[in-house]
């Protein structure tokens, strides 16, 4: 997205908006079990102008057992500890989630090589559109 400076014209954000919203929804599903990570991602997108300010435009009622996506196969390192055990949230450096108990110092946990990144999700979506 940065090479538009060389071309002299900004990208058409109206065209890109749908792609970004799909990426954000994918991230929401990925981060669903860790609300602090989701809030952190939304704040980053709001700061950069990719997410509208104010209340989130997605369905805000809590997930039911039928609407909740299946849990991740392995615990993500950035989520809070279990029952006050592990360290708090990772990259955002915030305290652990309520379910995680006391949290910790917000130290970054180990990242597995096969953990998807936001860039991986966006690249996969762009590949699907082709």
From Swiss-Prot:
Residues 80-107 have a biased composition (Gly residues). InterPro entries: HEV_TT_vir_Orf2/Gyrovir_Vp2_N. Residues 48-130 are annotated as: Disordered. This is Uncharacterized ORF2 protein. It comes from Torque teno douroucouli virus (isolate At-TTV3).
């Amino acid at each position: 997205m940065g090479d538009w400076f060389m071309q002299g014209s900004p990208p058409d954000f109206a065209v890109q908006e749908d792609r970004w919203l799909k990426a954000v929804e994918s991230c929401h599903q990925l981060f669903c079990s860790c609300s602090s990570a989701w809030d952190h991602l939304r704040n980053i997108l709001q700061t950069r102008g990719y997410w509208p300010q104010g209340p989130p435009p997605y369905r805000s009622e809590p997930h039911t057992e039928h609407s909740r996506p299946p849990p991740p196969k392995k615990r993500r390192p950035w989520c809070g500890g279990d029952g006050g055990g592990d360290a708090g949230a990772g990259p955002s450096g915030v305290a652990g989630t309520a379910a995680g108990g006391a949290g910790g110092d917000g130290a970054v946990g180990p990242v597995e090589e096969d953990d998807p990144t936001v860039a991986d999700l966006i690249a996969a979506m762009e590949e699907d559109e082709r």
